[in-house]
UniProtKB/Swiss-Prot annotation:
It is found in: Secreted. This lipoprotein belongs to the group of structurally related '30 kDa proteins' that comprise major protein components of the fifth (and last) instar larvae and of pupae. GO terms for cellular component: extracellular region. Residues 1-16 form the signal peptide. Keywords: Lipoprotein, Secreted, Signal. This is Low molecular mass lipoprotein PBMHP-12. Transmembrane segments: none annotated. Disulfide bonds: none annotated. Gene3D superfamilies: 2.80.10.50, Lepidopteran low molecular weight (30 kD) lipoprotein, N-terminal domain (1.10.10.2400). Belongs to the 30 kDa lipoprotein family. Pfam families: Lipoprotein_11. Coiled coil: none annotated.
């Protein structure tokens, strides 16, 4: 009888162990949740990504969002910008402020910023002289990093599940655009100007974030030509370098072709 009693007492304990194991196995790990969020962003399902992010944050699991954002930037995913934009306009501004690098918030909020080319440490500006169309050539300034010559802000445009940006220069009230003509220094690279209007895709840009030596950087591409914004190798008497559109692959070289976006 003692054996029977002991056996009867052991059965509930074993059953409880089975139930506990089953519950644990049904609970998704943080890695699973990160993978699902990451994949939602990569496939362009931004509404789902925003819902997941808001849910994780409300449950005290914001580290999931933080890790996904870090991985997106390290992997140089353009979709990072769309995800950030949809959070910004979809009740997720606090998530952007908390888990994205500062530069993302500056871009989305339309704050005044400086665009500094990493390779030469020069800030983007528009020249003082104009052509017959009242356009100004864009340069990297050899000295200035503090006046409104190098002050810009971004205006967002959402189209076909993508976010694009118009870059507005504070000093001259003009928009950064890429010319249809090429630079005389390189027959493949296009000249970059500031112009009064912003009614075509030549005045629209998209960003690809990257990380290099712990710095958050951006490749800046023109929507119409898909050329990356860069500064040329030729230096004028003022120490300025002309801005052009690079006709070629740049994503593998963030140390050369990327930009810092910093507060003005």
């Amino acid at each position: 009888m003692k054996l029977l009693v002991v056996f009867a007492m052991c059965v509930p304990a074993a059953s409880a162990g089975v139930v506990e194991l089953s519950a644990d196995s049904m609970s998704p790990s943080n890695q699973d949740l990160e993978d699902k969020l990451y994949n939602s962003i990569l496939t362009g399902d931004y509404d789902s990504a925003v819902r997941k992010s808001l849910e994780y944050e409300s449950q005290g699991q914001g580290s999931i969002v933080q890790n996904v954002v870090n991985n997106l930037i390290i992997d140089k995913r353009r979709n990072t910008m769309e995800y950030c934009y949809k959070l910004w306009v979809g009740n997720g501004q606090d998530i952007v402020k908390k888990y994205f690098p500062l530069s993302f918030r500056l871009i989305m909020a339309g704050n005044y910023v400086k665009l500094i080319y990493r390779n030469y440490n020069l800030a983007l500006k528009l020249g003082s002289t104009t052509n017959p169309s009242n356009e100004r050539i864009a340069y990297g300034d050899g000295v200035d990093k503090h006046t409104d010559l190098v002050s810009w802000k971004f205006i967002t445009l959402w189209e076909n599940n993508r976010v694009y940006f118009k870059a507005h220069n504070t000093k001259y009230n003009q928009y950064l655009k890429m010319s249809t003509s090429t630079c005389n220094c390189n027959a493949r690279d296009r000249v970059v100007y500031g112009g009064n209007s912003a009614d075509s895709t030549r005045e629209q840009w998209f960003f690809q974030p990257a990380k290099y030596e712990n710095d958050v950087l951006f490749f800046i591409y023109n929507r119409q030509f898909n050329d990356a914004l860069e500064l040329g190798t030729i230096v004028n008497a003022s120490g300025d370098r002309k801005a052009v559109g690079h006709d070629g692959e740049v994503a593998g070289l963030p140390d050369i072709y990327s930009w810092f976006i910093t507060p003005f």
